[in-house]
């Protein structure tokens, strides 16, 4: 069973991710964003970043491609309703393809509990 992690931007639910991938030693989880009722994720993030002065690392308006540093107002919630703790989430993607979130600063304790499947997979590779 996959776990859905709810994403909110400035207090508004925008969708979820399943955090399909992780780099446990680095405290990073990442995955595809599934948007709910968002016509243009590019416009959503571009407007948000301009409004809140969040640094954009790549912006190609013609392709509607954007990448950002950590967005402080982007919150991730666990199934129990608690907010995922860490440094925060950055996004990248384009409207015609997909968007991904990379969440950094996950503690080793949280990696061992919430993301134990990723930790197990990592340990089996060594």
Where in the sequence are the language-model features?
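Terminal leader/tail segments of proteins
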Residues: 1-9, 13-126
């Amino acid at each position: 069973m996959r776990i859905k992690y709810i994403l909110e931007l400035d207090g508004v639910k925008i969708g979820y991710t399943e955090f399909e991938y992780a780099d446990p030693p680095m405290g990073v989880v990442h995955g595809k964003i599934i948007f709910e009722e968002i016509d243009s994720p590019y416009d959503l993030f571009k407007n948000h970043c301009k409004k809140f002065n969040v640094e954009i690392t790549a912006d190609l308006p013609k392709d509607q491609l954007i990448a950002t540093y950590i967005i402080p107002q982007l919150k991730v919630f666990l199934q129990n309703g608690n907010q995922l703790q860490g440094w925060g989430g950055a996004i990248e993607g384009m409207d015609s393809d997909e968007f991904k979130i990379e969440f950094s600063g996950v503690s080793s304790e949280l990696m061992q509990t919430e993301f134990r499947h990723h930790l197990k997979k990592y340990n089996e590779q060594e």
